[in-house]
A protein has these predicted regions:
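Glycine-rich phosphate- or other oxyanion-binding loops that anchor nucleotides, phosphorylated ligands
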Residues: 28-31, 54-259
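Bacterial N-terminal signal peptides that target proteins for export
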Residues: 1-9
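Short, conserved "active-site rim" segments that organize catalytic pockets and cofactor/ligand binding
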Residues: 28-48, 70
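Bacterial N-terminal signal peptides
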Residues: 9-18
């Protein structure tokens, strides 16, 4: 009798678990798209068929579709902390299996003109240093690396999308350097170039890259050049950042067709 009672209790529990599972809707894989500023995501949000908006950590995560693809678009705010939190939330709360970071950047290489677009080969944090305790400049302790590589298939799709969307603009592939600073002095720029090389600098990409690396999630960073990172084009930054961000966003829209 006791065994029968235990069996019935276990059976009831199992049925309850199964019924609870049937009531849950599985979250479909999505592509996460991150921009730091409103100008960097406004076109994407206008184009998307937004189904739902959820606020987490002061950020609005907009779930919808673009070109038949499930996407989650979010303005994360400036800086590496915001960007890292945002990427991790997209991956773990919204089941994003790919992450795209779009926006503007300052050039580090003289061959880049304002308006040109950079697609990341990898990303580094130019302001991260623990050399005093034996690590290389920029190296993230206990990860064995300082540069986080972008996904090759996403890079290819991004380059093709730029070439097809804005064919009169040059597209480059290379390193993106990130730090919690707006680089506007020649000395700052030269230090970054000396330490890490790179094609452009901004404030979010490498944090997103590290979060994706830790979560084993493919990513790519796409940045349009808005200034020269040396203070010589401060007026141009305000004038062209909107256009540059828009060209980047248009390229992302085309890229989604290829993913």
């Amino acid at each position: 009798m006791k065994k029968k009672t235990i069996f019935l209790a276990m059976l009831i529990m199992l049925i309850g678990i199964m019924l609870a599972g049937c009531g849950q809707k599985e979250t479909q894989p999505a592509i996460g798209i991150i921009g730091a500023m409103e100008e960097e995501v406004s076109l994407l949000k206008e184009t998307a068929d937004i189904k739902k908006t959820t606020e987490i950590a002061g950020m609005e995560f907009c779930e919808g579709t673009i070109e038949g693809k499930d996407v989650v678009i979010v303005q994360c705010g400036m800086g590496k902390v915001n960007a890292g939190i945002c990427a991790n939330t997209l991956i773990n709360n919204f089941n994003c299996t790919k992450i795209i970071n779009t926006g503007v950047a300052g050039s580090l290489d003289n061959q880049l003109d304002i308006g040109d677009i950079v697609v990341s080969v990898d990303a580094v944090q130019h302001d991260f240093t623990v050399e005093a305790i034996g690590f290389e400049k920029g190296e993230i302790p206990y990860t064995g690396r300082y540069a986080f590589p972008a996904d090759e298939a996403m890079r290819k799709a991004a380059v093709e999308a730029v070439q097809e969307t804005v064919p009169d603009i040059h597209v480059f592939e290379g390193r993106i350097c990130s730090g919690d600073q707006f680089i506007s002095e020649k000395e700052q720029k030269e230090t970054i170039i000396s330490n890490f090389g790179g094609l452009c600098c901004e404030m979010e990409g490498a944090a997103i890259a590290q979060a994706c690396f830790l979560n084993d999630t493919p990513f790519v960073v796409i940045r349009a050049i808005s200034d020269k990172s040396d203070g010589s084009h401060s007026v141009e930054y305000e004038t062209f950042k909107g256009e540059a961000a828009n060209n980047c966003a248009r390229s992302v829209l085309e890229m989604l067709k290829k993913l």
